[in-house]
Amino acid sequence: MFSSRKTLKLHKGTKKEKVIEYPRTFPQRYTIKSYSREQARKLGVTIKLSTNPKKKLDVFSKKTGKKLASIGAAGMGDYPTFRAINADLGRWKRSHYKMRHEKDRHEKGTAGYYADKILW
């Protein structure tokens, strides 16, 4: 049977081993977290909820106001969302996201770059 929750074992085989439960999917309507706003400010961009129902955020240039990218799949988690559930879970998910997207997260100006810097 399909469960609506996932479990993750952190620090397997050590004294710090623990099991964390978290939702498989997240609500379709995303709320912008202060972490993401701060990261966007550091990059010199602004963020708003996306007009695309399949994405979380739209990224805009502060200088021109022009839309640069739509980032984050709606219904999926990100670092601030996972960190709110459990700090260790947030760190684990972040490190795995960065490994998985290593090839496309460094090219400035791409959606992958903004997703990495703002959501993770």
Where would I find each of the regions flagged by the language model?
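Arg/Lys-rich, low-complexity, intrinsically disordered basic segments
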Residues: 1-120
